[in-house]
Regions:
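Conserved beta-strand->loop/alpha-helix structural units within folded catalytic cores of enzymes
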Residues: 80-92, 111-113, 397, 429-436, ...
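Conserved flavin/dinucleotide-binding core of flavoenzymes
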Residues: 34-70, 124, 188-189, 193-194, ...
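N-terminal glycine-rich phosphate/pyrophosphate-binding loop and immediately adjacent elements
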Residues: 39, 67-255
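Short, solvent-exposed loop/turn and secondary-structure capping segments
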Residues: 93-95, 118-125, 441-445, 478-479, ...
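Active-site/ligand-binding neighborhood in enzyme catalytic cores
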Residues: 225-395, 405-409
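Mid-domain catalytic core of redox enzymes
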Residues: 385, 389, 393-517, 526
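Active-site rim elements
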Residues: 134-145, 247-254, 337-346, 451-456, ...
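Extreme N-terminal leader/targeting segments of oxidoreductases
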Residues: 2-81, 99-104
Length: 629
């Protein structure tokens, strides 16, 4: 067992044994670290996200064709509503149901994971007695200017003040520490380990306050380990734009929507260097649904591709769209009207926790976002029989069927598997807030057109690894706030967002512990293969890797990138959480047919609206609850 695996075991599994002797340094994080946890998933290290044990029963049905989960044990439990899926949409559905029909209504939420929140995954790293909080999925509250009344009322009711981020987010942090965006070329792919202080793309621009590169593009290209031919071709891409396309100006807008980005690279610009194409393919990461080899020019331009600002190089093609009206072109602030600062330390897990706290008051302390950020939830409270809302984790729903003809049924039977045993409960209604693509496999009598619509959906695989490190001196030395990594599994690495809320304080000095976020939207091996084929390939590959595989990749990545005199993996890395989401972003729209009610069963989840934003998850939950009438 490697050192990091031993540390993971000690920190993740045996924390309770050592909690009483952790050093106290007077911070809110230290007080929290000293609390003895029992069942507390946020501190679990190793493979997280869709962790081992969370998807096996669902995959047996969807991939293996298994339809018989054994005779269920009938429990003497009947609810007004059962919610399948404990992500933000499922939690919001339970919340809205009580708001609509009374807080005395009995609701049970079933989820296949060992924690609630779905993609809104809280990661807590205990680094020498100091709790560092990170996010393992759903990242921020985006598009605030477009929130509807339902969303705003929910946020207000659970204790979220959107104005607090203007002070909580330390936009001057990067300037104070001289941190910007760079690119890391690794030895395994590019022939040598080298960091160039230029991102060559617009992806890092979403991080408010991150310094823009002052290194001229020509000098940056010259510093890369590319061949002479590769450097010439990279420069051609960076200086490209609408001016190289020989068509009338008025036809440009249609052109970029109907022509492939990779066709533009290879045929229009004549790029054939595999390393330049690799850089181009890996720039969008989680901005888009798949790699840039599967997208149109217009889709890629939205993701900050290789090259200068698209609002300059593709000005006539993209026009003066809504985004261009609020982007700031100068300085280090990306957006004026809706800056990307609405981020809790644990991402949108704070929203999930506030919803749980609202419905199960005894789960922990705090009544708003500031107070709850360091609250150590008592998971023993989640499924108490005395609760009007109960959350049952590690429970995979495998069958949902009406007790009679759907149009006049009086209830719904729900079968689920917990600890390899099948149980049955009953409810007056069910909200399916799970991945919509699994619904046809567990609701057996769906109408054919609805079955087909839901089966057509897919998911974009994503991965977000959080690394607890004792210091970030190496990042400081290289001036890295975010670094693009086109040769690695994780395509970008960044310091956690500089947010301090309540008694939680963000790292102040490079000598302090912090979390490194390593991002990945893995791609298939074949350039240009259809996106869905690539998703499937990546999904199997992702789930086939062990923690040792991920640890070795992370070890090689960080050790090759950071200065050896300032970073030693075994000494400085305290903990690793690999949040694998083999089923990540929504892909495909089920339409009205797919999301329509079916008897006493209604459908929520952001999948129902073909978007992965939290406001969509909440909006679809609201609709699904209204349809329960």
């Amino acid at each position: 067992m490697s050192d990091i695996t031993r540390r993971n075991f000690v920190n993740g599994t045996l924390m309770a044994a050592g909690a009483s002797v952790l050093p106290m340094v007077g911070t809110g994080q230290a007080v929290m670290a000293a609390l003895t946890p029992s069942y507390y998933p946020p501190t679990r290290t190793g493979l997280r996200g869709s962790h081992p044990g969370s998807n096996e029963h669902a995959h047996a049905r969807a991939w293996g064709g298994q339809s018989n989960s054994g005779a269920p044990t009938a429990l003497n439990e009947e609810y007004d509503l059962v919610v399948v899926g404990g992500g933000i949409s499922g939690l919001a559905a339970a919340y809205f149901y009580q708001q609509e029909y009374g807080t005395d209504k009995k609701v049970l939420i079933l989820d296949n994971h060992d924690d609630f929140g779905g993609h809104a995954k809280r990661n807590e790293h205990n680094i020498d007695g100091d709790i560092r909080i990170g996010f393992g999925g759903s990242e921020s509250l985006e598009g605030k200017r477009d929130y509807d009344e339902v969303m705003l009322n929910l946020l207000k009711d659970i204790g979220v003040d959107l104005e607090l981020f203007s002070e909580a987010y330390d936009v001057d942090f990067y300037k104070r520490h001289n941190l910007g965006a760079s690119t890391y070329f690794n030895k395994r792919i590019f022939g040598e380990d080298k960091v160039v202080k230029h991102p060559f793309c617009g992806y890092p621009a979403f991080i408010e306050g991150l310094l823009r590169s002052k290194l001229p593009m020509e000098k940056a290209v010259e510093q890369t380990p590319l061949s002479k031919k590769g450097k010439e071709q990279l420069m051609r891409v960076l200086k490209g734009g609408e001016h190289v396309i020989d068509i009338p100006k008025e036809d440009l807008k249609e052109y970029i929507h109907t022509h492939s980005y990779f066709d533009y690279l290879t045929n229009t610009l004549g790029v054939d260097d595999p390393l330049v194409l690799r850089m181009a393919r890996h720039t969008s990461i989680d901005y888009t649904e798949g790699g840039t080899d599967t997208l149109s020019i217009a889709e890629v331009l939205e993701s900050g591709p290789l090259g200068i600002d698209p609002s300059i190089s593709w000005k006539n093609a993209i026009g003066d769209g809504s985004d261009q009206k609020y982007l700031r072109k100068e300085g280090d602030t990306f957006s004026l009207k809706d800056p990307y600062i609405h981020h809790f330390p644990d991402g949108n897990a704070t929203i999930a926790r506030l919803l749980v706290k609202k419905m199960i008051p005894n789960v922990g302390s705090g009544t708003n976002a500031q107070e709850i950020i360091l609250s150590k939830f008592n998971y023993d409270e989640l499924d108490k029989p005395s609760n009007n809302v109960r959350i049952r984790l590690n429970s995979t729903v495998v069958n949902v069927v009406h007790d009679g003809p759907p149009h006049n049924a009086s209830g719904v039977y729900i079968n689920y598997i917990n600890n390899n045993k099948t149980y049955q409960i009953k409810a007056k209604g069910v909200v399916m807030a799970c991945y919509n693509m699994i619904i046809p496999h567990i609701v057996p009598d769906l109408p054919q057109d609805q079955y087909v619509a839901l089966r057509s959906l897919n998911k974009v695989p994503l991965q977000l690894s959080t690394i607890g490190v004792r210091n970030w001196r190496g990042m400081k030395e290289l001036g890295i706030g975010m670094v693009m990594c086109p040769g690695n599994m994780h395509q970008a690495v960044n310091l956690d967002f500089p947010v301090s809320i309540g008694d939680y304080e963000y790292t102040k000095s490079p000598d302090d512990p912090c979390i490194l976020h390593m991002r990945s939207a893995p791609l298939g091996e074949t350039i240009g293969a259809p996106a869905i084929e690539q998703f499937k390939e990546v999904r199997y590959r992702m789930l086939g890797l062990t923690f040792d595989d991920y640890e070795q990749e992370i070890r090689e990545h960080l050790s090759g990138m950071l200065p050896k005199e300032l970073f030693n993996f075994d000494r400085d890395v305290q903990s690793i959480m690999v949040n694998r989401w083999a089923h990540g972003y929504s892909y495909g729209d089920p339409g009205d047919i797919g999301r329509q009610p079916f008897g006493r069963i209604t459908i929520a989840n952001s999948d129902a609206n073909d978007t992965s934003l939290v406001q969509s998850a909440i909006g679809q939950a609201y609709r699904a609850v209204k349809e329960q009438m």
